[in-house]
């Protein structure tokens, strides 16, 4: 969610209709870098941002956690899954074996893929992991840059649909309830939460 999409409608409606001003806030909506808003918020360059519950796990744990906290869910369920062109024959996680997958190289991401593939009777070691350079899912799939991509349906899936791509898709939440985590979430800088609770509450 590093580019504006329908998941962010509420933020833009609040800005356009003056809800932020009514709450005594001056809100500037800025474009996050392609690697997400997390580092921007952690550095204090933004008070709030959009992230994902699963990707947060790797950087809020450990000996030097990133100083951010999820304060709200934008969507109550996980709307993500794996999309591929129909002619690749990937209708289930097991069938990802023998095909390429665009990975963000995150431990939790790859752990989810491994669990899904193995639980479905597939061989995770045969899933060819390619470091993801995907910025346009339609182009990446239609030109065979990669066979399968982890997407969030609310925009990337609809984008592929609008482009007329003939695709297969399976959602993680349908595979195992444990994967029905919040996506996406609103995060805040921990220092901001501690120092200005009233502002955070007003923003929400």
Predicted features along the sequence, with ranges:
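Extended ligand-binding regions for polar small-molecule ligands
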Residues: 17-21, 182-204
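Short, glycine-/small- and polar/acidic-enriched structural segments
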Residues: 1-143, 147-154, 170-174, 179-180
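N-terminal low-complexity, intrinsically disordered segments
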Residues: 166-167
């Amino acid at each position: 969610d590093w580019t504006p999409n329908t998941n962010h409608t509420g933020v833009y409606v609040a800005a356009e209709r003056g809800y932020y001003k009514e709450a005594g806030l001056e809100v500037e909506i800025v474009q996050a870098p392609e690697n997400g808003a997390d580092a921007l918020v952690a550095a204090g360059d933004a008070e709030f941002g959009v992230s994902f519950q699963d990707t947060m796990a790797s950087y809020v744990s450990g000996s030097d956690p990133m100083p951010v906290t999820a304060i709200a869910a934008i969507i109550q369920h996980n709307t993500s899954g794996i999309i591929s062109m129909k002619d690749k024959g990937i209708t289930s996680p097991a069938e990802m074996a023998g095909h390429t997958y665009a990975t963000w190289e995150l431990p939790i991401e790859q752990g989810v893929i491994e669990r899904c593939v193995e639980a479905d009777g597939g061989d995770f070691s045969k899933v060819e992991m390619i470091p993801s350079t995907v910025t346009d899912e339609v182009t990446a799939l239609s030109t065979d840059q990669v066979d399968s991509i982890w997407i969030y349906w609310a925009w990337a899936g609809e984008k592929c649909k609008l482009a007329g791509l003939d695709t297969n898709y399976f959602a993680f939440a349908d595979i195992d309830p444990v994967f029905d985590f919040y996506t996406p979430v609103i995060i805040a800088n921990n220092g901001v939460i501690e120092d200005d609770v009233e502002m955070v509450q007003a923003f929400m």
